[in-house]
């Protein structure tokens, strides 16, 4: 559903930011 997509996007976005700031 849409909410799952939003949550997954948020998770990947956060992980990408954390990975980028290493």
Curated annotation (Swiss-Prot):
Coiled coil: none
Tissue distribution of the protein: Expressed by the skin glands.
Localization in the cell: Secreted
UniProt entry keywords in alphabetical sequence: Amphibian defense peptide, Antibiotic, Antimicrobial, Immunity, Innate immunity, Secreted
Gene Ontology biological process terms from the UniProt entry: defense response to bacterium; innate immune response
GO cellular component annotations of the record: extracellular region
Function description: Has antibacterial activity.
Family to which this protein belongs: Belongs to the frog skin active peptide (FSAP) family. Brevinin subfamily.
Name of the featured protein: Brevinin-2LTa
Organism whose genome encodes this protein: Rana latastei (Italian agile frog)
């Amino acid at each position: 559903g849409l909410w799952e997509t939003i949550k997954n996007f948020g998770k990947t976005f956060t992980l990408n930011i954390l990975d980028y700031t290493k």
